[in-house]
């Protein structure tokens, strides 16, 4: 709705008028595949930390504070968080396609076209949740005649907003309170994220060891990389699926930020090239997202100095975010320049945000928090965010270093926050220009690798352990 209103206002001085019509794409798309309405299942409190009833109390307080009688939730991930449910409607995000509404008296309605299992039916009945088909939303609002409904213009489709306007006496346009509650992870969710990142780190480290023992003669390609990573993650406890389609781009493909290899466009790995691997996993206790840039087969051919320089500048920016401390109230765009500084010094930059929010067994991209030039959300305690500066030279190579971080209070100063790094996997030392790092940056690299080794070594065997020890060996200036 917000985008529609913005567009409408931009042409207000013209004679253009708007008319509602049926979606033309739906009329033309004759062989449209059926939506995957998977079974809804309950997400256990041992992973969520808060029961549905506890979350309901938080939301009702917000409804009362805003002097409203209901809250309409248009984002499926907010409904899934609020009701502690998940589904498999999408390939990489455990979502249920749905809308929901909660009244200040505690009545809850979920609108979806899913068949409900007996277990979920019982769960809904016990928690005063009524399930209705999406097609009944207009009739529902017509019969209810709410006096004042909260809904978020940024996330509510125009058609649904029109129904609310038509049948509610009044409304309030505010950010959905679920979004911020969901973004600020509780202690159980943070503990789950830490544990999930250990297992994910085991899979990724075993992958890096495997790759380091290959050569150009093995004729590996980008799809081989995707398949190997998936096989290793599938062995880990609580793994459900990748958290997004793996990006494995070598050479010029690495410069395509959201590259996807397929059988018609799939490069072989060559010595001296860089391989950018951006991947992640959905685990019952957390969601991961990690990028490593790897110098391919360095024993056969060294990477050139330009690539090492660019990698080191990206690393310096990554470290700057990881080590930042900031006052409560700081917003994402205030932190973003820290990551770009060392590239900008050379007239370079990257055309994406430095960090996005990440869910807890939900979306790998989650708002409202971000570290970017557009990031206006205050960074709050418990928010999990990616730290992923990069550099991309078109038609040649791409570099990105990504760890997930969680905002936490500083031990000695409750008025300031800092970040704790969650991701555990070696950073390729073959690409670091050590003489470009200052003492504090070297200390960070060594401390990070020390933590990686201490945490993951117990899961490595024989040659894997020897390789990990060497990969995490301290660098000296």
What positions do the PLM features span?
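Active-site neighborhoods and metal-handling regions in enzymes and metal-associated proteins
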Residues: 1-477
């Amino acid at each position: 709705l917000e985008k529609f209103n913005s567009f409408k206002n931009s042409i207000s001085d013209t004679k253009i008028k708007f008319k509602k019509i049926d979606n033309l794409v739906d009329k033309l798309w004759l062989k449209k595949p059926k939506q995957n309405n998977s079974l809804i299942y309950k997400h256990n409190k041992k992973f969520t930390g808060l029961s549905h009833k506890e979350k309901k109390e938080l939301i009702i307080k917000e409804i009362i504070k805003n002097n409203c009688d209901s809250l309409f939730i248009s984002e499926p991930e907010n409904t899934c968080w609020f009701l502690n449910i998940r589904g498999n409607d999408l390939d990489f995000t455990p979502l249920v396609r749905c809308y929901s509404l909660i009244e200040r008296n505690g009545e809850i309605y979920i609108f979806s076209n899913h068949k409900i299992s007996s277990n979920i039916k019982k769960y809904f009945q016990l928690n005063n949740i009524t399930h209705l088909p999406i097609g009944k939303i207009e009739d529902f609002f017509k019969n209810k005649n709410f006096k004042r409904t909260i809904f978020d213009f940024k996330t509510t489709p125009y058609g649904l907003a029109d129904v609310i306007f038509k049948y509610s006496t009044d409304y309030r346009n505010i950010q959905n309170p679920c979004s911020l509650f969901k973004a600020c992870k509780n202690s159980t969710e943070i503990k789950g994220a830490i544990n999930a990142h250990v297992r994910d780190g085991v899979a990724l480290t075993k992958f890096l060891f495997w790759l380091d023992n290959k050569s150009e003669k093995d004729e590996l390609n980008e799809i081989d990389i995707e398949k190997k990573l998936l096989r290793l993650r599938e062995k880990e406890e609580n793994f459900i699926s990748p958290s997004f389609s793996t990006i494995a781009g070598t050479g010029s493909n690495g410069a395509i930020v959201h590259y996807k290899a397929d059988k018609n466009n799939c490069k072989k790995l060559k010595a001296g090239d860089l391989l950018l691997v951006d991947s992640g996993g959905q685990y019952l206790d957390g969601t991961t997202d990690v990028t490593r840039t790897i110098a391919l087969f360095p024993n056969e051919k060294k990477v050139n100095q330009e690539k090492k320089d660019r990698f080191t500048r990206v690393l310096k920016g990554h470290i700057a975010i990881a080590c930042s401390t900031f006052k409560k109230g700081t917003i994402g765009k205030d932190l973003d320049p820290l990551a770009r500084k060392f590239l900008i010094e050379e007239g370079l930059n990257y055309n994406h945000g430095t960090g996005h929010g990440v869910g807890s067994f939900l979306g790998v991209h989650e708002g409202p928090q971000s570290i970017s030039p557009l990031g206006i959300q205050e960074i709050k305690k418990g928010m999990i965010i990616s730290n992923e500066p990069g550099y991309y030279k078109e038609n040649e190579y791409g570099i990105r270093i990504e760890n997930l971080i969680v905002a936490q209070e500083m031990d000695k100063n409750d008025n300031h926050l800092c970040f704790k790094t969650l991701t555990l996997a070696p950073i390729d030392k073959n690409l670091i220009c050590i003489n470009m790092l200052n003492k504090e940056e070297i200390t960070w690299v060594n401390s990070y690798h020390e933590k990686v080794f201490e945490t993951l070594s117990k899961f490595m065997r024989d040659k894997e352990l020897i390789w990990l020890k060497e990969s995490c060996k301290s660098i000296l200036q």
